[in-house]
Amino acid sequence: MSLSPDNSSTAASKLKPRGSSQGGMRQYNERVVLQAIRLNGQISGAEIARLTHLTAQAISLITKRLLDDELLIKKTPQRGKVGQPSVPLVLNPDGAFAIGVKVGRRSLDILLVDFSGAVRERWNLSYDFADPNQILGHISQCLAKIKHKLSAKLWERVQGIGIAAPLHMGGWQQLLGLDADVVARWERFQLKEEIATLTGLPVQTLKDTTAACVAELVAGRGRDMRNFVYVFVDTFIGGGLVLDSHLHLGKHGNAGALGSLPLGLNGGGKHSPQLLNVASLFKLESRFITAGLDGRATSDERAASPEYWPHTQAWIAETAPPIAFAMLNSTCLLDLEGVILDGCFCSAVKEALIVAVEAAMQDFNWEGIVAPQVFAGTIGSDARALGGALLPLYANFAPDRDLFLKLDNAQ
């Protein structure tokens, strides 16, 4: 499978949740109101009017429509010192749903996400190597379970499916020991078309680590940062790039492909190793297996347990300097505000890796540039599937159809 991500334009100017009281803007202003509530939580109509610069009358009409459409819920009125009690409004979690599918090299994740962005159901399938037929069969089973769990009315509110997957599932064949037949099947397999045919739902696709970056951008620490590189460590390390609060995809949807970054000059007729060769979880998995331990422990709390920790520490010591080197090169080009690091591992491993990366950054020459601060990602292993689910939700309900536009609170 050679994934072709749905590349939305990044040229749109930055948008605040501010509406227009002119005619013909009903749908847009409804999206503005929904986004204001999404960003600010439980707020009153008066507060929505202040944030969006729409009139009180317009807000009253819009919120009535959204309440009638069951996209909003009224909460208990709050009495102030004077005047009528204010009625807080919140998003109705059952107002809409989306399905996120992460197809990885070692596992498959499927999430049912509600209108508030909360994960309602999850399924996981682990494997040694990704087989397209096995993956499609499991997705089909999970979608049937979702349809069974939701009433017919709620199933009609499913906005679509977002797929997060590597651009080239058959890549780095020798590194992972992939069977040539499996690689050939992936080259012929059209996952997006197969799932669309299976469900009849709209299907959107995005590179897996870019989808993870989407989740962090709109639901995590990225909401407070305008320019950052996002690093996600899984079987292979990868990433995403946010510039001026926009997710930057690049010409081929592959911006932020940190895993392919060379770690030095070619020499002796050999290519320099790439970052993914030395700073990926498959290396930690190999360490565990060599020590007679369970390789699957890379993604859970066992990696920080006494039995596993010496091997995890050795991997961190090997991994941190190359990541720091990648941050140096990225900063030279982009003048970064920060780096957000996350991955498919427990919080203890993430925290230790960040400390090691920060220490390794001190060993490089930063003269002429300002070193970025390294932050822990807030989403974790769900980031890729959650980012996939956010694709249809934001396409249908955000003020701008460009998902990759982060909205600021109007002041």
Where are these regions (language model features)?
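Short, glycine/acidic-enriched loop or turn micro-motifs at the edges of active sites
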Residues: 105, 211, 235
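Glycine-rich phosphate-binding loop and adjoining helix at the ATP-binding site
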Residues: 119, 124-227, 352-363
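Short clusters of small/polar residues that mark proteolytic maturation junctions
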Residues: 48, 77, 124, 180, ...
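Glycine-rich phosphate-binding loop of actin/hexokinase-like ATP-binding domains
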Residues: 225-279
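Short glycine-aspartate micro-motif
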Residues: 98-102, 158-162, 228-232, 238-240
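Short helix-capping/turn signature of helix-turn-helix
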Residues: 39-40, 219, 234
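Short, active-site-adjacent cap segments at secondary-structure transitions
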Residues: 168-171, 211-213, 238-239, 248, ...
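ATP-binding/phosphotransfer module of carbohydrate and carboxylate kinases, centering on a glycine-rich
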Residues: 1-75, 81-124, 130-154, 199, ...
